[in-house]
Amino acid sequence: MLDTNVDEETVRRIVREEIQAALEKDPAKKKAAIIASKGTLDWAYPPLILSTAAAALGMEVAVFFTFYGLNIVHKDFESKLRVSPLANPGMPMPVPMPELANALPGMQGMATMMMKSMFRKKNVARIGELHEVARESGVRLIACQMTMDVFGYRQDEFVEGVEFAGAASFLSTARRGHLTLFI
């Protein structure tokens, strides 16, 4: 019979031990490169959650934020990261909505508010908390310098700990990794 009364620390210890054993078998898997190119609230979570999870597994992680993905690490991320129900046909809505209704003014704000509320109810970390976890975990958050130049962003407009580099510099880092994700 499966013991469901195992404490959280025991589970974490077992997972760490299993991951460490796997990494020792294949040390090339110790590096991950993630490219984040989308700048909406629902697309902000995957690169931050995956990068912090990879770091927790002992991997060296670099996340390259380019184009609208820069919104994720911009100081003004709270207002920049929104959800568009029009662009998310699979988004669960509490009340079925005709597609045309999603284009009405105010629907983006309502969808954003609903998603934040769902995350709060399920105790999902906020984006700012994930920034902090990433920094503390040693995840390299890298903003694309070319995209910053195109959009007119300055380095002081980004959250603490963000590095700035071009695509060639990031690719030099990414080519040494075993895992590369484009989000």
Please tell me what each predicted stretch does.
Residues I34-A44, M118-K122:
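Short, glycine-rich nucleotide/cofactor-binding loops
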Residues Y45-G58, V63:
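Histidine-anchored nucleotide/phosphate-binding helix
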